[in-house]
Curated annotation (Swiss-Prot):
Pfam families for the chain: Enolase_C, Enolase_N
Stored InterPro entries: Enolase (IPR000941), Enolase-like_C_sf (IPR036849), Enolase-like_N (IPR029017), Enolase_C (IPR020810), Enolase_CS (IPR020809), Enolase_N (IPR020811)
Family, similarity comment: Belongs to the enolase family.
Gene Ontology cellular component annotations, sorted alphabetically: phosphopyruvate hydratase complex
Residues engaged in binding (2R)-2-phosphoglycerate: S36, H157, K344, R373, S374
Cofactor or coenzyme needed: Mg(2+)
Name of this protein: Enolase
GO BP term, example: glycolytic process
Alphabetical keyword list: Acetylation, Cytoplasm, Glycolysis, Lyase, Magnesium, Metal-binding
Coiled-coil ranges per UniProt: none
Binding site for Mn(2+): D244, E294, D319
The record's free-text note on cofactor binding: Mg(2+) is required for catalysis and for stabilizing the dimer. Crystallized with Mn(2+).
Organism: Homarus gammarus
Catalysed reactions, as listed in the record: (2R)-2-phosphoglycerate = phosphoenolpyruvate + H2O
Length: 433
């Protein structure tokens, strides 16, 4: 059982404070760190920040850390719960918080403990973390995912004019995760050369998630650059393209989207309606091998979401729309608004609820894509999560910046450990199991 738990402040990949939790059992120390997003959905569980502008620009997490050390820890130790009782531990903490969005203790406090318990539970049972997660979800097999590498950054993640937040490559034609990594990294380096030749060396500086942020305004130009890099690498037909538009970031009001939202007092020439935006995506899909579009519209623009989803066979992913929240997922299912859940553990705030969100999506015929946040740490829990939940797809940045590679490298190790029994999602990434 749990002998000691201690939380502290550490720093994420953007230099912002976040919560880290050390949990001790007779099997040793188990450490977990909590990630943080830049473009956060209004319906997410509450990430507790102190708001004291004189410290860390208001982003300190002293209260969340204090809530772990002074509230959660004494109660959970007193309860006598074991680390193998993930569901019971998570339910206990949620009850202790008592609010729907974890605003009393903070989702970042609860999640830190929940992740550490999960790691300790696997060790207690003497099994790998991914296998423990599979057991928690009642899965017999595990599957290695197709990585979605975010190679061009725009939106709130980059200082360029590009409105759409992420342009990704998915090596669906690979036969193993190792091969997918080779294909992804080779295209990444070709893309760097293409951007350098066209825009100069300073255009190859990287954004928060390791992708390039060339100063382009036209979203189609980003797709052209990627297509050229795929061709140069010799992977045409083997690598497909995904997008995360994060359209809530440039939604104005009255169904108007501003593709030049980063220019203050712009001339309004880039303002378009939801239907025009949908037409733009349809054009993209005709001209490029696009297989997945995330958050194509504002998080409350249900009608345009449903129109888009009913009118295309590609994967439409809900992130800001669903925020890993069962209530939002249920509404999206009823409205047929999307076809895939983006799973972010810190949007819902515990391991059990994350697994439940995936199972709810799967039950309704959706896919699930596991995701990092733009403010990441070296913790690679989501690598084991994606393998254990057999979701078949993960996005955790470009093959650049160690907090991104930490996850991809862990999946490589898992593939090696599974040996000849390793199953790779490949072309079936949307419904691998």
């Amino acid at each position: 059982s749990i002998t000691k738990v201690f939380a502290r402040t550490i720093f994420d990949s953007r230099g912002n404070p976040t919560v880290e939790v050390d949990l001790y059992t007779s099997k040793g120390l188990f450490r977990a760190a909590v990630p943080s997003g830049a473009s956060t959905g209004v319906h997410e569980a509450l990430e507790m920040r102190d708001g004291d502008k004189s410290k860390y620009h208001g982003k300190s997490v002293f209260n969340a850390v204090k809530n772990v050390n002074d509230v959660i820890v004494p109660e959970i130790i007193k309860s006598g719960l074991k680390v193998t009782q993930q569901k019971e531990c998570d339910e206990f903490m949620c009850k202790l918080d008592g609010t729907e969005n974890k605003s009393s203790l903070g989702a970042n406090a609860i999640l830190g403990v929940s992740l550490a318990i999960c790691k300790a539970g696997a060790a207690e049972l003497g099994i790998p973390l991914y296998r423990h997660i599979a057991n928690l979800a009642n899965y017999d097999e595990v599957i290695l995912p197709v990585p979605a590498f975010n190679v061009i950054n725009g939106g709130s993640h980059a200082g360029n004019k590009l409105a759409m937040q992420e342009f990704m490559i998915l090596p669906t034609g690979a036969t193993s995760f190792t091969e997918a990594m080779r294909m992804g990294t080779e295209v990444y380096h070709h893309l760097k050369a293409v951007i350098k030749a066209r825009f100069g060396l300073d255009a190859t500086a990287v954004g928060d998630e390791g992708g390039f942020a060339p100063n382009i305004l036209n979203n189609k130009d980003a797709l052209d650059l990627i297509q050229e890099a795929i061709k140069k690498a010799g992977y045409t037909g083997k690598i497909e393209i995904g997008m995360d538009v994060a359209a809530s970031e440039f939604y104005k009001q009255n169904n108007i989207y501003d593709l030049d939202f980063k220019t203050a007092n712009n001339d309004g020439s880039q303002k378009i309606s939801g239907d025009q935006l949908r037409d733009m995506y349809m054009e993209f899909c005709k001209d490029f091998p696009i297989v997945s579009i995330e958050d194509p519209f504002d998080q409350d623009d249900w009608e345009t979401w449903s129109k888009m989803t009913s009118g295309t066979t590609i994967q439409i992913v809900g992130d800001d729309l669903t925020v890993t929240n069962p209530k939002r997922i249920t509404t999206a299912v009823e409205k047929k608004a999307c076809k895939c859940l983006l799973l972010k553990v810190n949007q819902i705030g515990s391991v059990t609820e994350s697994i439940d969100a995936h199972l709810l999506a799967k039950k309704n015929g959706w896919g699930t894509m596991v995701s990092h946040r733009s403010g990441e740490t070296e913790d690679c829990f989501i690598a084991d999560l994606v393998v254990g939940l057999c979701t078949g797809q993960i996005k955790t940045g470009a093959p650049c910046r160690s907090e991104r590679l930490a996850k991809y490298n862990q999946i490589l190790r898992i593939e090696e450990e599974l040996g000849s029994g390793a199953k790779f999602a490949g072309k079936n990434f949307r419904a691998p199991s």
